[in-house]
Amino acid sequence: MSFPDFSASDAHIQWQRFCDLSWYHDDLGVWLDISRMHVNASDLQQLQPRMDKAFAAMQELEAGAIANPDEQRQVGHYWLRTPELAPSSELQQHISREIDLIAAFGRDVVNGTIKAPNGEAFTDVLWIGIGGSGLGPALMIKALQNPGEGLPFHFFDNVDPNGMSNVLAGLEGRLDRTLVVTVSKSGGTPEPHLGMEQARHRLEAAGGQWAGQAVAVTMLDSKLDQQAQKEGWLKRFDMFDWVGGRTSITSAVGLLPGALIGCDIRDFLSGASQMDAATRMADLRRNPAALMAASWHVAGGGRGQRDMVVLPYRDRLEVFSRYLQQLVMESLGKRLDRNGDVVHQGIAVYGNKGSTDQHAYVQQLRDGVDNFFATFIEVLEDVSDIPTISGECPGDFLDGFLQGTRSALTESGRQSMTISMRCFDARRLGALIALFERAVGLYGELVNINAYHQPGVEAGKKAAAAILNLQGRVEAILADGVARSADEIRLALGDGTDESIFWILRHLTGNQRGFSAQGDWSQPASMRFSKG
């Protein structure tokens, strides 16, 4: 495991490190270069015993071990692209059958065989999903949809009323021909439920027929699945209980959008499967995900002390940094390790796209605080319909900007790694996602945290539910028309805090809900609120 130590000023050493630390997959046409990370041979030697344990843990996970003890469930997203790895023949058949059903449904909607209830072809898709159920589909659409192919997509990925209003306004006149897909694993998550009810209300008001336009992606026998069965929805697809939202893109959550834009979803799965095979290798120097995880660990001192800046030099990958933000931060951002010790682990992720970012925050990356490492992503092949004009080729400039930024960062002693792809399509997107999924899993093992649960997210959901409950009680107190301060309401309730009650009242008075406020807003304690 010998290669030169990092040197920012010696071009010969940089070249030698590039040759020694480059990984390449011939069939996929994918390179990984970690030579500009400050990783030395001694670092990899020191990590080797822990990486060996990480390889073994990942092997157990793929074999069906309980990987998420909090929920006593398996973690099986790797089975989705290689069904024969699933621990039972019944499960293998179920996965394969779902893929076939998704592909057939998408094809039949796109070619007009499956029609809207009014007898016309579907014109649009309204996708309702939060977190990974929204980010994964958004990535699929941005990365893989070609102009004029498949159906246009519109998203409810938040409960912002203004956002919903804008989306619905954009569907005006086509709501009765819009396919509405609601994604909710448990069927009980508030955000997709609220979006679904708003979509149903507007669709039916426009003359649509909900059951004939609605599709559910959820666990079998969940609340949403039961509702879809009872109401006779157009289609239901399974969201397996052993697939987490942030790793659900190779399930129906990502495959259905792919099928509805005319993408070959089997190519997408094939790319992920090929990268899974490459990252399954228990050899640190020959496993790209292990090289990435080791680089992250060394760069951040095993404590996430450096942010990951994602710089894909293609517009199609503009959503990828946000997708990785959830995958990495929700997986690795943990207060406790598996021993119950407080560790506050995590890697912060941000980014957008090159070369746009060179005119934004790259200034700080080069000259400001050195608290990050960059991840460049390049695609070599350019489209053929953008010609060279007056000797100037946009693709050459894009490549030059990437190399220039990479060199400028190195000159400043800033760390980076680069992923290069010969071309970009569904197969390469699948491979790219699988590469990061495995790197996240391996890193989680290196720092001894559970990368497959999200207690912080659950805590936020419980706190939100408590606020909504408090709001109902505040409204009940004010129903008598008597003006009260936040403190008086708290005393009457015997619960809550002045601040949370003030926030609730400020929201209520900001909308036409019949509540009014008197006093000086700059003096919150002086404000009095009433209804009527």
From Swiss-Prot:
Q: Listed disulfide bonds for this chain?
A: none
Q: Which pathway is recorded for this entry?
A: Carbohydrate biosynthesis; gluconeogenesis; Carbohydrate degradation; glycolysis; D-glyceraldehyde 3-phosphate and glycerone phosphate from D-glucose: step 2/4
User: Where do the catalytic residues lie?
Assistant: 330 (proton donor), 359, 461
Q: In its keyword annotation, does this UniProt entry include Cell membrane? A: no
Q: Which reaction does it catalyse?
A: alpha-D-glucose 6-phosphate = beta-D-fructose 6-phosphate
Give the main localization category.
cytoplasm
Q: Which InterPro entries match?
A: G6P_Isomerase, Phosphoglucose_isomerase_CS, SIS_dom_sf, SIS_PGI_1, SIS_PGI_2
Instruction: Tell me if Hydrolase is a UniProt keyword of this record.
Output: no
Instruction: Name the EC number(s).
Output: 5.3.1.9
Which compartment or compartments is the protein found in? Cytoplasm
Identify the GO cellular component terms for this protein. cytosol
Looking at its record, which EC class is this enzyme?
A: isomerase
The record's keywords, sorted A to Z, are: Cytoplasm, Gluconeogenesis, Glycolysis, Isomerase
What HAMAP family does the record tag this protein with? G6P_isomerase
Give the family, as the similarity comment puts it.
Belongs to the GPI family.
Q: What does this protein do?
A: Catalyzes the reversible isomerization of glucose-6-phosphate to fructose-6-phosphate.
- The protein in question is named Glucose-6-phosphate isomerase
The organism named in the record is Synechococcus sp. (strain CC9605)
Coding gene? pgi
